A protein has these predicted regions:
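Hydrophobic face of amphipathic alpha-helices that form TPR/SEL1-like repeat modules
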Residues: 19-24, 44-53, 82-92, 117-126, ...
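TPR/TPR-like (Sel1-like) alpha-helical repeat modules
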Residues: 68, 101, 131-156, 175, ...
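Inward-facing hydrophobic residues that define packing positions of alpha-helical scaffold repeats
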Residues: 30, 45, 70, 85-86, ...
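Alpha-helical solenoid scaffolds that mediate protein-protein interactions
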Residues: 8, 33, 72-73, 106, ...
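Terminal, low-structured helical/coil segments at or just beyond the last alpha-helical repeat
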Residues: 153-200
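Short helix-capping/linker turns of helical repeat alpha-solenoids
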Residues: 6, 10-13, 35-39, 51-53, ...
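N-terminal leader/linker segments that initiate helical-solenoid repeat arrays
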Residues: 1-22, 200
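Structural signature of tandem alpha-helical TPR/SEL1-like repeats
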Residues: 22-29, 55-69, 92-102, 132-137
């Protein structure tokens, strides 16, 4: 099986390169896939460096590499990369405007953690990112999260936050929020953690 992956990787198949990395055939394959523009490889490589992997002369060089790969993944349309980049910016006092952009974009793509972050911020529970308050959308998105099955923190947060949000809203606003949730579910991708096929 690995021989096929090697053949495909040598032909430029970035998925095969990631397979080789997961099969512990070397970090070089993940680096090649990232350099070739594979957004999953880019966010994985950024995460690997952030966790202390790889060798860098200075911490500053490591941070530049982390930022480079998270940004590349985000700009390539990867919702996981978007959230990793938004978190990187938040942890490093980055622009709140840019953080808001990536959180909202990842939420619109269905990333569960992004939807949770976006919903709590627009509902001001709390508003760490300075979003304008939108209780209807915040409740609607929180409701969608609360309906998820299978575990995870976001659904639990959703179920816990709904009553808090309801206290701040009129019955008409809650009804409007339920319609918002229906419309969002119809017009956006299904909510997902975007778990990688070959690893974590």
């Amino acid at each position: 099986m690995l021989s096929i992956a090697y053949e495909e990787a040598e032909r430029g198949d970035t998925e095969a390169m990631r397979v080789l990395y997961y099969a512990e055939e070397g970090l070089v394959w993940l680096e090649k896939a990232a350099e070739a523009g594979d957004t999953d490889a880019q966010q994985l490589l950024g995460s690997f460096y952030k966790a202390g992997g790889g060798w860098f002369l200075t911490t500053g060089n490591r941070n530049k590499a982390v930022e480079r790969w998270f940004l590349a993944s985000a700009e390539g349309g990867n919702p996981v990369g978007m959230m990793l980049y938004a978190n990187y910016l938040f942890e490093n006092d980055g622009s709140k405007k840019e953080i808001r952009h990536w959180v909202k974009t990842a939420a619109e793509m269905g990333h569960i953690d992004a939807v949770s972050t976006y919903a709590s911020n627009i509902a001001h529970l709390p508003n760490d990112l300075d979003f304008p308050e939108d209780l209807v959308a915040g409740y609607g998105l929180t409701y969608l999260l609360s309906q998820l099955q299978g575990g995870g923190v976001a659904p639990e947060d959703g179920r816990r936050n709904l009553p808090e949000l309801a206290k701040k809203m009129t019955p008409a606003q809650i009804e409007e929020a339920e319609v918002f949730a229906e419309d969002w579910a119809k017009s956006h991708p299904p909510l997902s953690y975007f778990v990688p096929v070959y690893g974590y």
